[in-house]
């Protein structure tokens, strides 16, 4: 019999509805798994009482015949989402002790759908990072290990590294993530799970701690494509409290899942064939093309000519918006306050921000402040916005020819913790395949598709038209079914 904690979101939901187990049994199993996996450092806080209370409510609802869409399912919540009555830190000392009095729209929707919360998941500080090494609460460790006998702890990706590590380790069935330049998709690829960033505006940003407001988007992370569709459906919807929220109906993504791609065209962007791409990544990409052809799709070569400018464009726009968003953290209203004896207001601001922000956050604030300064605004920020428009236009042109695009998700498998942290530019290059879709605001998903020579997961990315999450999910399902990815990390972390 399959252990409860090995079941994904759909398996738990359907098994609970069929009476195979109670919601309380589900909650107890996952609460125990979370408590026994401290070595992963995936959680900043654990909330077993929340998961248990939601489970007991689900059991009562089942007895009364009043089940909700996610009744019986406990989730992990990235600690970037405000949760009423539960600490929200964005993995930064700057928000130490901050307990929101309100609920983010996304978590409010999930809890209203019957889900419980197992805890708040670790992340890169203020979602800035690609390895989950910038958290003030310590590195998250991937549950995966190389098969060459080396025991170097591996990065789970970032910024949603707590989410990816916890799902891959089967200590949560699914989790929320956020994606600004790849923070759902790259961790998903590193840990052998599925993750989808929907169209910008599909999920409300209200109550999500802001990094770069024109790029930030909540999304779903789970074991597979179906689970991702279920979770994203529950998270999505118009919210008048978010001025960028899209007032469009939420489709029935799970009900309309289909791996039959007959009549669909899949684009292969030539600019993604970058120099020094590892042979294993290139081979998997070629295999993915054959899988989609086998599913009935026509393969078409396309061009996204401004792709090579995407990374520098992103690392101008995102820090610029971050420097503005993070100006609010000054020690006056909430969070950390560092008040040296005899200090005036300006000195308190300086001391608080110096103590509260980590090195990577400070680096991005400085970059952002520089490109927004009077002498450089037009040379950097204005020019980057123009290039962003060109990148979006490239996608528009491509989607006149094809329905979805297929690319690698990341330029490598997971790297060791500490391997790239000394060189910020090398770390930023991890986003090379994910950033373009973020700049264009289009939906994109990573699906686990194979293992490298050291036994580590590799992902393929599907990018779709605006609001065509269904097309992305369906292409992802076609790859998932043909890849047959069932690999799991060997359990070394449980007590």
Swiss-Prot record:
Record keyword Protein biosynthesis present:
yes
Top EC group: ligase
Q: What chemistry does it catalyse, as a reaction equation?
A: L-glutamyl-tRNA(Gln) + L-glutamine + ATP + H2O = L-glutaminyl-tRNA(Gln) + L-glutamate + ADP + phosphate + H(+)
Reported EC number(s) for this entry are 6.3.5.7
One GO cellular component this record assigns the protein to is: glutamyl-tRNA(Gln) amidotransferase complex
Q: Which GO terms describe its biological process?
A: translation
A GO molecular function annotation here is: glutaminyl-tRNA synthase (glutamine-hydrolyzing) activity
List keywords of the entry alphabetically.
ATP-binding, Ligase, Nucleotide-binding, Protein biosynthesis
- The reply on keyword Protein biosynthesis is yes
Give the superkingdom in one word.
Answer: Bacteria
Catalytic residues identified in the record: 78, 159, 183
On assembly, the entry states: Heterotrimer of A, B and C subunits.
- Give the UniProt family note: Belongs to the amidase family. GatA subfamily.
Functional description taken from the UniProt entry:
Allows the formation of correctly charged Gln-tRNA(Gln) through the transamidation of misacylated Glu-tRNA(Gln) in organisms which lack glutaminyl-tRNA synthetase. The reaction takes place in the presence of glutamine and ATP through an activated gamma-phospho-Glu-tRNA(Gln).
Under which name does UniProt file this protein? Glutamyl-tRNA(Gln) amidotransferase subunit A
**Organism the protein comes from:** Rhizorhabdus wittichii (strain DSM 6014 / CCUG 31198 / JCM 15750 / NBRC 105917 / EY 4224 / RW1) (Sphingomonas wittichii)
Encoding gene (name): gatA
